[in-house]
Each structure stands twice: as structure tokens, then as C-alpha cells.
């Protein structure tokens, strides 16, 4: 898929395991096609309950004595994204757009993305197309609706973002402990060495969920 002269491959994460997840998969594909995405690669993720996954590592950043574990769903989500990054890393494209099945594009998103990709620096590693929790965090305005974020303050969320292939080996190397949800894990262990940007306001929403700005 050519967007602003970049060779961007859309990749969708889905689960084929229960009627609930199959319906989300079907509805997501339908929306993506209607939104102008026709060359989608679909990657089956890790279904935590079906795989018998139970994360044992603790996430204690917010409460050092809490002995908190993120649970089956977040652990499986982390592992699913790790699979996606490895799939992308062997494909020939220069950039990848990672999508969740409940991603919903705003009207005019593709035209806006074409415009904003001309504002983001050509050597970017990671671009949030959709995000949450960016409001109030320090950033640097680059141009148009493009903002750069630096450690330790980053947007959150994983419903739509573009990654340059050159960044994938670093992501794969640094995402090796499923103790924290995937987006938090990126902020803590991966983003400090990457050039991270966001389009604000975001171009996508999450189906049936109002995300904080």
C-alpha cells in the first residue's frame, strides 16, 4: 500500500478461537476494506485461554510491593504482538501499519495520513496514528499535526501505528519479557532508543470504547 510514497504493509491481528473473536475479526476486516485498505495481511494471535497461558512475571512499577501480574489477556496480547513483529521483519516492505480488529478509522483518515507523512521526518522509527494518554505529556511540535515524544513521556495504545522496518530488530530484541502490557513495555524498554512521533489529534478510534486523549 503506497501512502505518501512509502511502501506500507497493513497487518491485522486477529483471533480465530471463539464466536466473539471471529465476529470482531470479520467486522474489522469489513471496516478496513471500506476504509480503503485492500492488501491486508492477517496474523493469528495467541489466544491466552486456548493456549493455557498464565504470565508469572510481576509488574510492580506502580506499586513495588503489590506483586501484580497482568493476567492471561495482557500476556497473550504481548506475545501476539511479538509474533507480528517477527512476521513483519521477514517481509520486504519498508514500513508496516499494525492494526487491531477493533480499530476504526475516522472519516478522511487516509487523506490526512498522506498529508502528515510528509511532515514527519523521513528517518522516523515509530508513528502513532492512533493513540491514547498523550494529553499533557511533553512533546516537540514538528509540523502539521506531527509531534515528537522523548523518554520517559510517550503516548499509549496499540490500535494503529506505523513502524519502519529498520526499527523492528530493536523492537524484537527489547520486547523479551511479557511482564507488562505491550504498550507500556514499548515505552519502558524500546522507545528510548527510537525516534517516536504521533499524529495529534489521532486519526483512529477504538470500537465501543472511548479512549482518553
What are these regions (language model features)?
Residues 1-99, 103-213:
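An acidic/histidine-cluster motif and surrounding catalytic segment
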